[in-house]
Amino acid sequence: MRYDRTIIAKNGREIHLRNADAFDGNAIQELFQLTHGETDYLLSYPDENKHDLEERSRLLAEKAESPNAIELLALDGSKLIASAGIHGVGTKYKVSHRAEFGISVLKAYWGLGIGRALMEACIQCAKDAGYVQLELDVVADNTRAIGMYHKAGFVEYGRNPKGFRSRTGAFQEVVSMRAEL
């Protein structure tokens, strides 16, 4: 699945949205470290990245050629500022119609429409891949993201009051959402 588009962010900057490929491994690793270190809304901590560069590059190459999965990047000039992607929930027939969506945007770029553009691109890619349902989990306190998801047609279908546990011992409620495509 291929994607390549330029958008204008709310700050007037041109942002290039494109597929990740095997050569983006280092930049994606750096983005992971930054985004996962500056907010508690994401699934993991910076030190929990489980892929080395070789493994990450292999996975990115596979995703770049996949007909039903995609990893998209947002670049401000040559600076990687966000990533988003979809992948199937599973390979069994009974769940083959469902995909999961994930996204991370550098905090300095929140509120500029970049997350929305990546999400809309992923929704279109999910439709093109033949999925009929797109799913995500979001921390309940992340009201900006939840509002964006609602506007895109996602609906809440469940809550887990102890969905995430932080290293401080506190819990975060996680909202499960889905959109019919």
Where are these regions (language model features)?
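Short acidic N-proximal helix/loop "leader" segments that mark the beginning
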Residues: 1-11
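Hydrophobic adenine-recognition pocket in adenosine-nucleotide-binding enzymes
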Residues: 20, 105, 138
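Conserved catalytic-core motifs of GNAT/GCN5-like acyltransferases
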Residues: 135-138, 150, 155-172
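Conserved acetyl-CoA pyrophosphate-binding loop and the N-cap/start of the following alpha-helix
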Residues: 109, 113-121
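Helix-loop element at the rim of GNAT/NAT acetyltransferase active sites that forms part
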Residues: 11, 30-47
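A short beta-loop-alpha structural element at the N-terminal edge
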Residues: 15-27
